[in-house]
């Protein structure tokens, strides 16, 4: 163990400043931080198993963008792009589940039978839990999930002594 002082002490986050930056950040799919945050969120759960490194992962909009275009049932288009509406999902499933209503996506998250055999569901535990416990995924769910992600990340920063 080193007796040197922690040089990182000068770079710790001010909690309010961090929350302001986080709340103003646009988590668009093309920004690397978006996929990093939702991957952190998925693996922050103790019951999330590791997936094969060969697994191709994409960003899933739990509340489909296409659904917003058709129904206009959210107060703004920005909510579709909220971090609270995004999850990582295997590409093989995202292709099938992309434009459906939540009640239809549940089948793809859970897996289903076809005449040619079973189609495996996602290994993302949060999505299978959502499918088991929710009949829909609405604006209030997006907001609650966003707040859970933010608060959990702040707790993570605190537990690693990264907050001033």
Label the model's feature ranges.
Residues 2-79, 83, 88-89, 95:
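Intrinsically disordered, low-complexity N-proximal targeting/linker segments that flank membranes
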């Amino acid at each position: 163990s080193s007796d040197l002082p922690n040089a990182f002490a000068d770079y710790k986050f001010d909690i309010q400043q961090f929350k302001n930056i986080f709340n103003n950040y646009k988590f668009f799919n093309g920004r690397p931080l978006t996929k990093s945050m939702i991957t952190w969120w998925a693996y922050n759960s103790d019951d999330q198993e590791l997936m094969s490194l060969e697994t191709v992962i994409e960003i899933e909009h739990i509340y489909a963008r296409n659904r917003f275009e058709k129904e206009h049932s959210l107060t703004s288009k920005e909510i579709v792009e909220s971090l609270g509406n995004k999850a990582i999902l295997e590409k093989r499933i995202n292709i099938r589940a992309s434009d459906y209503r939540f009640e239809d996506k549940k089948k793809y998250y859970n897996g289903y039978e076809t005449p040619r055999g079973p189609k495996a569901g996602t290994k993302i535990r949060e999505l299978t839990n959502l499918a088991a416990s929710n009949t829909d995924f609405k604006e209030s769910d997006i907001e609650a999930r966003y707040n859970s992600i933010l608060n959990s990340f702040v707790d993570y920063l605190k537990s690693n002594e990264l907050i001033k």
